[in-house]
């Protein structure tokens, strides 16, 4: 029996299911996203190795170029407000809210030069995805061993200043799509105080109008990205961290609730001062 007619029939059946079922469309789009991540990771890893020969933060520009194309598959648009606040040539800790697997697209839309991320160690073993993260200079934390994680963070604090690095961290510690922010973990703030570098909060509006895992829908939409003013840490000590966490959380939560109330569907009008990401 010919293979191609079977594949064509399966594809037609899948397309029919997608048209008839919102849940089928959701799962098909998520599957495509995962396939894109693995495929692009493999291709980008090869490009990074050919271009830079190994692990370096410079590979992030290559990774970003690939990932920024994902939004065209899904009809997503990112409206970035005050992006210049991320572009200053200085080390800093960038903190942002963490909603879903789609966060990587939002991150790459505004990722500044010489910026690395912190990720859980399990991702290192995720095939080509782990490889491209390693090549991009991502720092992996073993959450099960707090002493090891603290050692990595201490080393990172020194490297930030020495190598003029920006570090991107999700202080909620886990994905959260409940329409609000979770309490922040303190690691990012201890890191900023240790290195005496500013904290730059980045807030993404809620994805819930176009992406919802509970209701199983995944449509096109617009994400508002607000970069807040940097919070200085010069002269602060570990004793100041709880107040620093509270200040940052309140500012980000207020912004999140505000920008998530604006229309997020296609055709929505952006507010003043909005700069579309290219």
UniProtKB/Swiss-Prot annotation:
<keyword id="KW-0225">Disease variant</keyword>
<feature type="topological domain" description="Lumenal">
    <location>
        <begin position="24"/>
        <end position="29"/>
    </location>
</feature>
<feature type="short sequence motif" description="EGTR motif">
    <location>
        <begin position="172"/>
        <end position="175"/>
    </location>
</feature>
<keyword id="KW-0472">Membrane</keyword>
<feature type="transmembrane region" description="Helical">
    <location>
        <begin position="122"/>
        <end position="142"/>
    </location>
</feature>
<keyword id="KW-0443">Lipid metabolism</keyword>
<comment type="similarity">
    <text>Belongs to the 1-acyl-sn-glycerol-3-phosphate acyltransferase family.</text>
</comment>
<dbReference type="GO" id="GO:0003841">
    <property type="term" value="F:1-acylglycerol-3-phosphate O-acyltransferase activity"/>
</dbReference>
<dbReference type="GO" id="GO:0009410">
    <property type="term" value="P:response to xenobiotic stimulus"/>
</dbReference>
<comment type="function">
    <text>Converts 1-acyl-sn-glycerol-3-phosphate (lysophosphatidic acid or LPA) into 1,2-diacyl-sn-glycerol-3-phosphate (phosphatidic acid or PA) by incorporating an acyl moiety at the sn-2 position of the glycerol backbone.</text>
</comment>
<dbReference type="Pfam" id="PF01553">
    <property type="entry name" value="Acyltransferase"/>
</dbReference>
<keyword id="KW-0594">Phospholipid biosynthesis</keyword>
<dbReference type="GO" id="GO:0005886">
    <property type="term" value="C:plasma membrane"/>
</dbReference>
<dbReference type="GO" id="GO:0005783">
    <property type="term" value="C:endoplasmic reticulum"/>
</dbReference>
<keyword id="KW-0012">Acyltransferase</keyword>
<feature type="topological domain" description="Cytoplasmic">
    <location>
        <begin position="51"/>
        <end position="121"/>
    </location>
</feature>
<dbReference type="GO" id="GO:0006644">
    <property type="term" value="P:phospholipid metabolic process"/>
</dbReference>
<dbReference type="GO" id="GO:0005789">
    <property type="term" value="C:endoplasmic reticulum membrane"/>
</dbReference>
<dbReference type="GO" id="GO:0001819">
    <property type="term" value="P:positive regulation of cytokine production"/>
</dbReference>
<keyword id="KW-0219">Diabetes mellitus</keyword>
<keyword id="KW-0808">Transferase</keyword>
<feature type="short sequence motif" description="HXXXXD motif">
    <location>
        <begin position="98"/>
        <end position="103"/>
    </location>
</feature>
<dbReference type="GO" id="GO:0035579">
    <property type="term" value="C:specific granule membrane"/>
</dbReference>
<dbReference type="GO" id="GO:0008544">
    <property type="term" value="P:epidermis development"/>
</dbReference>
<dbReference type="InterPro" id="IPR002123">
    <property type="entry name" value="Plipid/glycerol_acylTrfase"/>
</dbReference>
<dbReference type="GO" id="GO:0016024">
    <property type="term" value="P:CDP-diacylglycerol biosynthetic process"/>
</dbReference>
<dbReference type="GO" id="GO:0006654">
    <property type="term" value="P:phosphatidic acid biosynthetic process"/>
</dbReference>
<keyword id="KW-1022">Congenital generalized lipodystrophy</keyword>
<feature type="topological domain" description="Lumenal">
    <location>
        <begin position="143"/>
        <end position="278"/>
    </location>
</feature>
<dbReference type="GO" id="GO:0019432">
    <property type="term" value="P:triglyceride biosynthetic process"/>
</dbReference>
<keyword id="KW-0732">Signal</keyword>
<protein>
    <recommendedName>
        <fullName>1-acyl-sn-glycerol-3-phosphate acyltransferase beta</fullName>
        <ecNumber>2.3.1.51</ecNumber>
    </recommendedName>
</protein>
<feature type="transmembrane region" description="Helical">
    <location>
        <begin position="30"/>
        <end position="50"/>
    </location>
</feature>
<dbReference type="GO" id="GO:0001961">
    <property type="term" value="P:positive regulation of cytokine-mediated signaling pathway"/>
</dbReference>
<keyword id="KW-0444">Lipid biosynthesis</keyword>
<comment type="pathway">
    <text>Phospholipid metabolism; CDP-diacylglycerol biosynthesis; CDP-diacylglycerol from sn-glycerol 3-phosphate: step 2/3.</text>
</comment>
<feature type="signal peptide">
    <location>
        <begin position="1"/>
        <end position="23"/>
    </location>
</feature>
<keyword id="KW-0812">Transmembrane</keyword>
<dbReference type="InterPro" id="IPR004552">
    <property type="entry name" value="AGP_acyltrans"/>
</dbReference>
<keyword id="KW-1133">Transmembrane helix</keyword>
<keyword id="KW-0256">Endoplasmic reticulum</keyword>
<keyword id="KW-1208">Phospholipid metabolism</keyword>
């Amino acid at each position: 029996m010919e293979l191609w007619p079977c594949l064509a029939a399966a594809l037609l059946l899948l397309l029919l299911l997608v048209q008839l079922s919102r849940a089928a469309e959701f799962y098909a789009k998520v599957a495509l996203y995962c396939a894109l991540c693995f495929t692009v990771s493999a291709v980008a890893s090869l490009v990074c190795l050919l271009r830079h020969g190994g692990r370096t933060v410079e590979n992030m520009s290559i990774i970003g170029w690939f990932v920024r194309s994902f939004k065209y598959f899904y009809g997503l648009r990112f409206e970035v407000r005050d992006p210049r606040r991320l572009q200053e040539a200085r080390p800093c800790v960038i903190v942002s809210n963490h909603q879903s697997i789609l966060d990587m697209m939002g991150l790459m839309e505004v990722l500044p030069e010489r910026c690395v991320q912190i990720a859980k160690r399990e991702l290192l073993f995720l095939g080509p995805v782990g490889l491209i993260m390693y090549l991009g200079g991502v720092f992996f934390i073993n959450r099960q061993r707090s002493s090891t994680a603290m050692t990595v963070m201490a080393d990172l604090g020194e490297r930030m200043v020495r190598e003029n690095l920006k570090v991107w961290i999700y202080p909620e510690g886990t994905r959260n799509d409940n329409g609000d922010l979770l309490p922040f973990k303190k690691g990012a703030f201890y890191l900023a105080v240790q290195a005496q570098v500013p904290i730059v909060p980045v807030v993404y509006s809620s994805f819930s109008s176009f992406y919802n895992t509970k209701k199983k829908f995944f449509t096109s939409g617009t994400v508002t990205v607000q970069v807040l003013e940097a919070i200085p840490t010069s002269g602060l000590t570990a004793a100041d961290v709880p107040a620093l966490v509270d200040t940052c959380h309140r500012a980000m939560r207020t912004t999140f609730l505000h920008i998530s109330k604006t229309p997020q569907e296609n055709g929505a009008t952006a507010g003043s001062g909005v700069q579309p990401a290219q």
